[in-house]
Amino acid sequence: MSRALRFAPLVLLVILLAGLIWRLATPTDTVVTSKMEGKPLPAFVLPAMLPGKPALSSQDLAAGEPRLVNFFASWCVPCIAEAPVLQQLKQRGVAIDGIAVRDRPEDVAAFLARNGDPYQRIGSDAQSRVQIALGSSGVPESFVIDGRGVIRYQHIGAIKPADVALIMRQLEQAR
């Protein structure tokens, strides 16, 4: 009896580890349908983050052309990885506006100098109010907005090269 009790913690540990490995190996559904999709943007006006770059408002995003709105930050490591993909989208004719979250102008300027600037406008969301109103919880995160200011798609996390076709398709459907 005591021998069985001695091995019980080891057996329990093996069972827990096996369960953990199984859970980590099981693919999860990475597509999250936003509760904001199909809804108009909440009204907002953000100040310009940088001199020479226009400010950003919800009215700018209802000007007739589908756009990609990208929440980013200079301190965000995945945003650095996403930067070349945003440049690729810009080269393909995608209109991209940025919302800098909890950031400083000098840090954003340095980030864009190092990683490229795909943005037509950059608004400063210093208190994350617009980010929260859109149901976003982190950076990077992007939204496809149709020409009437309605949210058509929410992409959580960095846009990767494999996501470009999906983003282009979402923008085309937003026309």
Outline where the language-model segments fall:
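Conserved Rossmann-like nucleotide-binding pocket used by diverse enzymes
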Residues: P42, F72, D97
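A short beta-strand-turn-helix
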Residues: V45-L68
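Conserved segment of the thioredoxin-like fold in thiol-based oxidoreductases
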Residues: Q91-Q127, V139
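Short pre-active-site segment immediately N-terminal to redox-active cysteine/selenocysteine motifs
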Residues: G64-R67, F72-W75, G138
